């Protein structure tokens, strides 16, 4: 029968080619058009199975074969479908491990492609939004009016020039004469020479008399520094030469005038203030008082300074009266404005009166300037109440923060010692297990999870509506299924079979919420925080500044036991939902027995209520109605008993059906326990108290350490281990249990199973056959041990000696040794063992003398041999437990090595190859070269 080409739904299906090729050849166009909706570009497995194994079939059609397709569907399920001739019918899924692995990878790749597509669409949308925003930004910038360059009016320029001219006129501050002649120059030169000579004479006299004062030393140092750091021909000397004609106020007023004209928002008011302060002579004393003034009080001050230029007494009188008049005439103002105006008038009065006093006494207002600055600093110091003050710009933005506390820069260890004090508390260590954490990745975002038992626990809002989520653990990605989500914000995921965490967290049996520890992975870094917690019903709150991605993290106590699952983040405090052991499993429906018990209680309650009503209220009813409605107590009890009897009978039948295989064995005479010490005699006795068990749990010990401690405590309580006879096996007595009590045995009868005891080969005749035996091939001789036989044994030997001699005479005959064919599986090196040497009876005392005296085991040899046996046993047990048999060759190697060191036969023997050479095979080509002959 000719078949068509194999059918492949896609290129991946052709590349993988899972299943039977013959089944693919059976595909017809009708079958192809009716195929289920498998995942696009995914492989399928085709099977050609007997019809009777799938559908109920009788007759010849039982052995007909049908095509079965297995693959992944678009809805995310895995299924198998068989074609019954009309359509594809779903059957129980056939597990193809390679197909399932491939579908898992394809599903993950499709999910990543979908996420990539959504990310690209989102990126394109965001890029378009950015372009729109850029265009809108450019359009709005064009709509903003550009500030015009500031124009300075000519009148202010002229006023500034006048002030500059006034400040630069030396005037009365010059120190040079106007009329200079040759005589005046000669007089000045002579005067300078005379002063210089006088200073030199005074200096020499002081040096001679040693009468040098501190002022003389300071003058000398100043001259040295002047000539050392400033050369004689330098531009600084020229600048200072011309500056000394002016006072500090002239220079300062010149700078202020230029700055006011260029940058001031009110140049007129500022220039008028500079001019009046210069004309009145108050000068620098005016500047510290300007912050206390308002616009009105500033013009009052300027007016009084102009008045002072003409009549100082009138100006002083008006300045003193100004605050009094202001208090009276400005009382209609608002409080804030009223206070500001009065403060400015008081500052004006202080300036005019104090300036006049300073000018009269000292001729300058420098002292008043210093006093006003000192008052301002004291006022600022009284404002510094907080630990720091903030400096803001015009928009209210904080540009700097200055601490008010005075910091000792040089000797600050005294302050630190005083602040630190003495430690009165000790912080405890907490147990954390980073290996029990993982990252939960969903299309909506990422969260944290932890391993507990066979589940992965996380927050329910992290999982969302997803049925499968990705679990990232130690750089690998796994897919886990959501198993159960209780009413709390908790989700339980089934741990994948190929995921083996290094640690797992356990629930706390005695929860302590006073101090909690939160640990999670944030940006692939482990973060841990400890804080005090408060309980609010089923939730916890703690002052921890948690971050996004920590939802689902475990909240543990100091022993590393889980208390709750992290849930919320408010920026300052974190919240968690408390987890209980009952949350791990869904609430089970009540069993049939419980339902019956509830029904009985309900019927009893109804019966009691009916009885009470019957005793309190009695009404006349017809006899027919009474016959229909009256129910006695006995009837209700009988109904309940009947229902309970039926249900209990059903329950007993089910239990008997389950226990039927175990009830067939009858009780008989057994020998269980014979030949060994009884075990578990202390079973049922508590070896650990409740306090000891709780203490071990609170220490957070792992399973191995916990078991070691229990074994140690049991050993101390018992005093000695249980003894077990190694030569006794329960399998030897299995046949006794099949015999009933009604069977009688004849214990004197000897049953022969045709299993004769082998007779050891005679050792004396061997010496006649082989007169010169080799030393290595001699059998082991136990004659070194002194013979100690009882009287009974000697009598038995004497009685059997004649029979033995007759048997030896019949057996001992010279037999010519013949060659025996080699065994198919035998050792190919060393001498053949003498098998007769192994055929002898020996007891425990004989075993001590098997080896010759020089080769007997010492205590050290026993220790070394015991360590090797323990090592081999550990390797084998570890391989069996972990199902990793790659270490077994190491055990075989150690066994061969020990046998080689002891001179014994190795565990592995080379087997002679059964491959025989062909009949005409001449062997390998000779490489020795041609033969050379000599003549």
From Swiss-Prot:
Changing residue 196 to S: In strain: Dresden. InterPro entries: Astro_1A, Astro_p19, Astro_VPg, Mamastrovirus_p20, Peptidase_S1_PA, Peptidase_S1_PA_chymotrypsin. Changing residue 614 to V: In strain: Oxford. Its EC number is 3.4.21.-. The chain crosses the membrane at residues 239-259, 286-306, 313-333, 344-364. The active site is at 461 (charge relay system), 489 (charge relay system), 551 (charge relay system). Changing residue 651 to S: In strain: Dresden. Changing residue 318 to M: In strain: Dresden. The modification O-(5'-phospho-RNA)-tyrosine is found at residue 693. Residues 104-142, 587-620 form a coiled coil. Keywords: Coiled coil, Covalent protein-RNA linkage, Host membrane, Hydrolase, Membrane, Phosphoprotein, Protease, Serine protease, Transmembrane, Transmembrane helix, Viral RNA replication. Changing residue 843 to N: In strain: Oxford. It catalyses: RNA(n) + a ribonucleoside 5'-triphosphate = RNA(n+1) + diphosphate. One of its GO terms (cellular component) is membrane. GO terms for molecular function: 5'-3' RNA polymerase activity; serine-type endopeptidase activity; serine-type exopeptidase activity. Residues 756-828, 915-935 are annotated as: Disordered. Belongs to the astroviridae polyprotein 1A family. This is Non-structural polyprotein 1A. It comes from Human astrovirus-1 (HAstV-1).
